[in-house]
Amino acid sequence: MTSNTVFVTVGTTSFDALVRVIDSDACLEALLRRGFRRVVIQLGTGTHVPARDAYAGEGAGGGRIAIEHFRHSPSLAQHIADAGLVISHGGAGTIMEVLRARTPLVAVINGKLMGNHQAELGGELAARGHLICTTPKKLVSALQSADDLASLLPWPDADEDAFGRLCDEEMGFAGAPARPHDE
């Protein structure tokens, strides 16, 4: 594990169900047992605010986990980069930002949103081994039973020339000379 910090983000709206679970003794204990010592929570517009700034472990190893929170930030990139684990809502933008940063991710689906797009995206990316996908009710269990988070598959680097090659192929330019930026 590169960092002992967990970053939790709910996005720009509210996801109190996620914040409440993170704030529970069971979840904090599960994180502590995984070696995490600090949790930073981005609350969004939610109403649940953690009342404590630390949790003292109950397990055999004891330990303590610090808890910090804030509402919004112009960018979450540094929080993501500084984390050893991100626990996030299932929004596509956040999922992709975390995967591109190559930080282990647990995506928590907000079932109160319309449609099922978060479950579809999270489920597919979990099936491909890139993240763990769960719900607020199953988060603690997922954290307790997950294998080594470092074994999640990294998101592949972008192929910036793929679209151009596809266009060339579709237009019949497969034998065309390389573009200047390809050389």
Regions found by a protein language model. Give the residues of each.
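Donor-nucleotide binding loops and adjacent catalytic segments primarily
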Residues: T2-D82
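Short, structured coil segments at secondary-structure junctions
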Residues: G35, I65, A101-R102, R128-G129
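Short acidic-hydrophobic, aromatic-tinged amphipathic segments that line or gate anion-handling sites
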Residues: E68-R71, L131-A142
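A donor-sugar binding/catalytic signature common to diverse glycosyltransferases
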Residues: L76-G115
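CheY-like receiver
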Residues: H79-D82, S141-A146
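Acidic/polar active-site rim loop that often engages polyanionic ligands
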Residues: A101-L105, E124, D148-L149
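Active-site-proximal loop->helix
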Residues: N110-C133
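C-terminal amphipathic helix plus adjacent low-complexity
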Residues: A146-E183
